[in-house]
Every structure is written in C-alpha cells, then in structure tokens.
Amino acid sequence: MLNGLSIRSLPVIFGRPEAPVTDGGRIVLPAGEFAQIANGEEARFIAYLEFLVGEGRSRGNHVHARRAEALYVVRGRLRARWADVASGEREEQVLKGGDLVHVAPGLAHAYEALEYTQAIEFSATPFDPLDVTPYRF
C-alpha cells in the first residue's frame, strides 16, 4: 500500500451493540443504518459526492500539496486510483459501500463509478483551489 494511504472497511454490527462504537462502525437497526465515520477528528470541509457511471466521468484526477482528505463510500462501487507524485508509485483498488479512505498530501487521486455511488468527503483543512494540481493517470 502506498505510504500515506489507508483503506478500511467499517465493521457492521446488526442490532444494538453491547459496547459503544468509538472507532468507526456501521450499526444496522430496524429503523435504518447509522454509520460513525469519524470520532474526534476535526472537519473543516464536508462534501456529499454523487458518482454516475459513464465514460469520461472520473472525478478527482488531481493532487493536493497541503491537504489530507478522507472519503467514505456510503453505497455503490468505485474504481480508485492513487499515485505518489514524488516516487511515481501507483495503486488501484475497488472501493465499496462502508469503505473509508484517508489520502495524505502528495497522493494524486481519481475515482470512477462502477455503479451509481454516493460518498462523503471530509478534511480538517478548508478547500483551497490553489492547492489543487491536475494529475493525469
């Protein structure tokens, strides 16, 4: 795995948990699902993302020099690509609903829907358009 990249599938608990969920998890109850994506992390940027299937609909394709980001896939599947711009090392994986990805500064990233997908992106750093450099995969 690339340095500065972490991918984790949040654990799923069916019914009320015996102990509090403090490190992320999905609790499925008759009334619906509760997903604790982060606990104790500061978020100064939060965005909802919808990914539609189709040629040329890849999102991202850029790198940030200063900003770390997290992406939580609510539902669907994405082909994710990352590249360490300093070393040239690359990685590709398929993300699915319940996956949580942390991307460090200096890692280019791109996401393409394999099926209709919804996700939430968050960061401790506000969005700065001057910290977005296009990257061609």
Language model regions located:
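Tight coil/turn sites that cap or link beta-strands
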Residues: 52-56, 97-98, 104-106, 116
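Double-stranded beta-helix
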Residues: 110-137
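Conserved short histidine dyad/triad with adjacent acidic residue
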Residues: 47-67
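Short acidic-glycine-tyrosine-enriched beta hairpin
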Residues: 85-105
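Structural motif
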Residues: 77-79, 100, 118
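Short, conserved beta-strand element in jelly-roll/cupin
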Residues: 51, 65-84, 122
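A short, N-terminal "cap"/entry segment at the start of jelly-roll beta-barrel domains
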Residues: 1-45
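His/acidic/aromatic-lined binding-pocket segments of jelly-roll/cupin-type domains
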Residues: 68-73, 93, 101, 110-111
